[in-house]
A protein has these predicted regions:
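Repeated loop/turn-to-beta-strand initiation elements of outer-membrane beta-barrel proteins
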Residues: 72-75, 106-110, 163-170, 216-222, ...
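Outer membrane beta-barrel
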Residues: 24-46, 50-177, 212-216
Length: 348
């Protein structure tokens, strides 16, 4: 019998890039509920900038409604927006998620809108720490590629519960055609004027499939993502494995990827991510990760880095964090630096 694990899907959608979450329920009754959630964070450090400064990590606010419409079907809708509450201005809010979904214990779950993708269900198992996590999943064009959050996607997921501790899951995703416009700033001569380059990319229909299994706390998965960009087929294979629950005892995850025209348009790349973490009963969680991307044709490392991080849950909804990311070098002549930060995240 096909049985959808709604709790697992909710956790994958909401918590996979954070350590904890909470939401304030503002209405519940007659099979309908409405909740507001999200978090804000601040840190002090050298965080992907040249100087030590106060910064944010990835604050957001969301609103989610659920309605039981009978016959075992629950319809839900969610909107989530990233916050720029330190600088403000015209870009104080940016869309992260926006979808309507329907779930049934046997029939599975269908979602339409901007959402976390089935690809990410497999590829995101190491994308856990607050400050420094899996960067290659968020490379340029990731919304259109569907490598983490996927823009304007139709997805379907279901889980087969083989036994009390064995479950097999699969997911399908589709994105339609679109033309994406991007801008990039450069400074050919320093000092000199800033040059802004605008490029267009034509995305054909894209599809992805994800298959995974959980065997008494040990998970394995495979996902495939493909579709043309301009005249090239941009495709990606990801294999992952993970063990445990992040923040509770031992957690370990490995991600290996092989891409063609997928990561920043490079013809062939390999990508690697490894994470090991240990969560103590007193709320302390310690982790170390490693990540790199290699150009297979030139055998040149695009970037490589490793981070040591500590997160401490003071109380439910309040987490402090500190991390140091070591630059391990590249083979393409780009100047890179170590980064570090310490901060606090408040959930509401």
């Amino acid at each position: 019998m096909m049985k959808l694990n709604n709790l697992a899907i909710a956790v994958a959608s909401t918590l996979i890039a954070s350590t904890s979450a909470s939401a304030a329920q503002i209405y519940s009754g007659d099979g309908t509920s409405l909740a507001v959630g999200g978090y804000v964070d601040v840190g002090i450090g050298k965080y992907f900038e040249d100087n030590v400064e106060v910064h944010q990590v990835s604050p957001r606010i969301n609103i989610e409604g659920k309605k039981d419409i009978g016959n075992g079907v629950t319809v839900d809708a969610k909107g989530e927006w990233g916050l720029n509450y330190l600088d403000g201005g015209n870009t104080s809010f940016t869309t992260r998620l926006g979808y309507i979904g329907a779930s049934h214990d046997q029939a599975g779950r269908l979602v339409v809108g901007t959402q976390w993708s089935p690809y990410y269900d497999v590829a995101g198992v190491a994308d856990m720490p607050i400050a420094f996590a899996n960067d290659f999943l968020y490379a340029s064009g990731y919304y259109d590629l569907g490598s983490s959050r996927a823009e304007k996607m139709v997805s379907y997921r279901n889980t087969l519960a083989v036994s009390s501790d064995i479950a097999l899951s699969f997911g399908l995703g589709w994105q339609g055609k679109k033309t994406a416009t991007s801008t990039e700033q450069s400074q050919p001569v320093n000092p000199g004027p800033i040059v802004v380059t605008t490029t267009n990319a034509d995305y054909d229909n894209r599809g992805q499939i994800a298959i995974s299994g959980d065997f008494a706390g040990f998970g394995v998965g495979y996902t495939y993502n493909a579709g043309d960009i301009d005249t090239e087929n941009a495709k990606s294979h990801i294999v992952s494995a993970n063990f445990g629950s992040y923040g509770k005892g031992i957690y370990a995850a490995l991600v290996w990827g092989k891409n063609e025209n997928f990561y920043k348009g490079i013809a062939q790349t390999y990508q690697y991510e490894a994470l090991a973490a240990f969560g103590l009963d007193n709320g302390v969680n310690i982790s170390v990760n490693y990540e790199s991307v290699e150009d297979d044709k030139t055998s040149k490392t695009q970037y490589s880095q490793s981070a040591l991080q500590v997160e401490y849950t003071i109380t439910s909804g309040l987490v402090t964090f500190a991390g140091y990311q070591f630059d391990l070098g590249n083979d393409i002549g780009e100047d890179e630096e170590d980064y570090y930060t310490a901060g606090v995240r408040y959930f509401f």
